[in-house]
């Protein structure tokens, strides 16, 4: 079971899909943190060399002083503190949307982990199934080859028929082809296993199978699928769309901002004559109400767009819920069917073994042809592999129930 432990210890941690999902979640969390900055004062410092054209009439009567200054130039320095006082819920809706987005990113991370766990387990079990099938075909092929050789000798001695020889050879060629086909299936399963687990499987026949409770206790029929991870992701799409619509609604309302500023104006910007070394200082404290009355219907169209997105998210959620519920019911029925079929397959193995022994005894007594012995031995071998693979199918079906319920929680530490 040492390799099975790698599901948590190595495979999930090192998997690229999980790493990417972790970074997406980290990005969403950082975005959420950035949205809170709207609640804090915004501090701005500006320094500039400015020119002004001032055509203000002077109070003096001298003809040369009819204009105070034709032009002004100087250094202007300021520091401004701006604080949002009230924005009709714009900021809170943006933060709530960022929260929902971060939560959805976390669910996507969980889904990535679920997928890689299921990928790892299925690669392991499908490798065992492919190995079982190939070994069974090899056994039948080997038996057919031995039987064919025996029949050829009997035909040479005049003790057997050519028809029986051809029938045996037909079976041999058939299972020779099946062995090559199952070899391709096994090679594909090995490649898949190696790609998933990052090591080459040796001695496949003695590899341990994952324990039945590796993902937890078996769920019950009728269990709600509300914890399905894909469904939870769809639910967050609804929340994100709802928060965006709240923001669009708030755009029709005014906002209130406060501003404190300190400004220094040097040189001619300070005002008056001969002011090269002069300086003017300004302090301002403003409270501003901003209300966009008309913007070319842009906000109205955006609001309609966001409302449509919310309705679409609701429809997608309902569709995912129905689909997931259907998948769980089908998976449960499949699990029950495979479980019931195990008893039938087990009994079939026993029957075929008994019939093979009886046919072999008849053959030794000269009452049955060798073709009958080969046929019963083949039936026994194939029923054995069918029973073995059905046991694996039962495990796969059970793990699929956990996946659909969002309960992929390996108990190994």
Where are these regions (language model features)?
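Bacterial Sec-pathway N-terminal export signals of envelope proteins
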Residues: 1-48, 54, 161, 194-244, ...
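Short, charged, amphipathic alpha-helical segments
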Residues: 22, 96-99, 162-173, 304, ...
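Small/polar-residue-enriched beta-strand and adjacent coil segments characteristic
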Residues: 42-111, 235-244, 251-320
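Outer-membrane beta-barrel domain signature
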Residues: 50, 54-57, 62-63, 177-184, ...
């Amino acid at each position: 079971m040492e390799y099975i432990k790698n599901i948590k210890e190595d495979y999930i941690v090192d998997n690229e899909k999980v790493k990417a999902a972790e970074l997406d979640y980290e990005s969403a969390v950082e975005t959420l943190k950035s949205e809170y900055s709207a609640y804090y004062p915004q501090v701005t410092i500006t320094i500039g060399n400015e020119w002004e054209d001032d055509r203000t009439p002077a109070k003096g009567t001298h003809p040369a002083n009819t204009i105070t200054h034709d032009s002004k130039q100087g250094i202007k320095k300021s520091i401004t503190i701006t604080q949002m006082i009230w924005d009709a819920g714009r900021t809170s809706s943006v933060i709530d949307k960022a929260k929902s987005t971060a939560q959805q990113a976390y669910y996507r991370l969980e889904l990535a982990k679920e997928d890689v766990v299921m990928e790892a387990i299925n690669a392991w079990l499908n490798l065992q199934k492919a190995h079982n099938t190939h070994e069974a075909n090899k056994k039948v092929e080997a038996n057919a080859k031995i039987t064919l050789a025996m029949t050829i000798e009997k035909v040479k001695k005049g003790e057997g028929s050519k028809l029986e020889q051809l029938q045996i050879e037909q079976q041999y060629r058939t299972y020779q082809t099946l062995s090559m086909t199952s070899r391709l299936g096994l090679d594909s399963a090995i490649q898949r296993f190696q790609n998933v687990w990052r090591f080459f499987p040796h001695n496949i026949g003695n590899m341990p199978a994952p324990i039945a409770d590796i993902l937890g206790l078996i769920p019950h029929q009728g269990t709600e699928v509300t914890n399905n991870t894909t469904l939870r992701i769809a639910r967050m799409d609804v929340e994100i769309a709802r928060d965006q619509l709240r923001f669009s609604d708030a755009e029709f309302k005014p906002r209130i901002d406060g501003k404190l500023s300190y400004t220094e104006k040097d040189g001619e910007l300070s005002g008056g004559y001969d002011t090269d070394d002069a300086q003017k200082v300004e302090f301002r404290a403003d409270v501003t109400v901003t209300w966009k009355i008309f913007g070319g219907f842009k906000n109205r169209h955006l609001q309609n767009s966001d409302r449509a997105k919310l309705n679409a998210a609701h429809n997608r959620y309902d569709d995912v819920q129905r689909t997931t519920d259907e998948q769980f019911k089908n998976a449960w029925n499949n699990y029950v069917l495979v479980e019931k079929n195990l008893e039938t397959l087990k009994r079939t193995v026993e029957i075929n073994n008994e019939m093979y022994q009886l046919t072999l005894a008849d053959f030794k007594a000269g009452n049955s042809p060798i073709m009958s012995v080969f046929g019963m031995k083949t039936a026994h071998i194939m029923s054995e592999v069918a029973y073995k693979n059905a046991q694996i199918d039962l495990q796969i079906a059970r793990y699929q129930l956990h996946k659909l319920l969002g309960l992929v929680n390996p108990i190994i530490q």
